[in-house]
Amino acid sequence: MLSYEQVLAAPLEELAEAAAKWQAAIKPLGEQQDAYRDRVIVPVRDSDWQGADADAAKPFMDKVSKELRDATKEAEAIHGVLVDAHREIDIARLDLRRLTDVEAPKMGRTVGPGGEVKPLRPVDPDDPDTWGPHLDFFQALAWEEDVSKQLSKAIINARARAHEADRAAAWALWQDTGADDMEFNPGGYANVSAAKGGLGESKFRESSDFIFAEMKTNSASPKVAEIRGLVKGSEGPLAVISPVAGVGSRGTGLALWYEQVKTGGPWDHKPQLEKKFDLQSNNDFYFKVPGREVSVSDDIYSNIHYGYVGRAAGISRPELMQGANGGIASTGTNDPGDDMSMKVGMDLYEKYGDRMTKEQMDAAILKLVDDMEARRRAGDTTMTQVRPW
């Protein structure tokens, strides 16, 4: 995320200058487009020009006309993105200055390098005057921490606003300009809000591709075959997934499973997605669902993998649920949304096995999102994995 100092020192003058240059380019591009149409396209279209030369020239003229139109639209989009980014970062910078210069002194706080919040007069156990007349030392200390946390959170939110605008603008400019310098991309993004949606949908699609590959690869891996052989090789009561799952082959298999899915383990995909997309602000961790005004947490992907690969390993549904809800798997201590995600993974394996297609997984994820969103709209506050976009 952009640092406190980076937001305050953001080169907004350069950004405004760039936006002005693109705005200045829009009018002459439009004029060239009109002139080419009136002086070349229309006269040729109204003439009786025929033959080999005409057959070769007309497609080329159409291409030039299209490029002029596309260049104008691209310039308009880039200008819009730059203006939006300037506004959002400027708002964030002004907010940081207000929090630092106005709100912090009111709250008895100072904001130092890195946006670190400190009390002007810290609570001192040896100085009752720092506690106030109505609080004891521990109450005063708790109040001091709470006030500092409130201000720190506001500073982080301002930084996040600048960070998200900067990231969305960079992505939009890459989309708008395209990979080929000789081609124009008129169907890009014309503002930061649209770019945030496009970036969110891109992360959703890439995450689905990533977790599908992980599910197919890991369910067919030697490690799963080893676990399945151990688990299937013994009968008996259900065991608990843990580092010391118990004696016998079943306990050994569950202990091996634990090592794969524990927090930070090879099959804990949350940090992998965090690194893949450089997720930093709270909003970064929610991906926009294509075609829906709803976003979904990156949590669901590791949960779906956990259920699918766990069933491929021969681990029973109750054992998988018990392991996750005990807070010992990579899914952590779960809520109902986590449970729904894991059950989707289990259902996919039980229904399709190793023949599951990407389309089948995608359909299941969309249904999961719709089910979660319906519950959230009905007032279920535990559905933290989805929220309005």
Regions found by a protein language model. Give the residues of each.
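Glycine-rich short-loop/terminal segments
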Residues: 178-308, 315, 319, 388
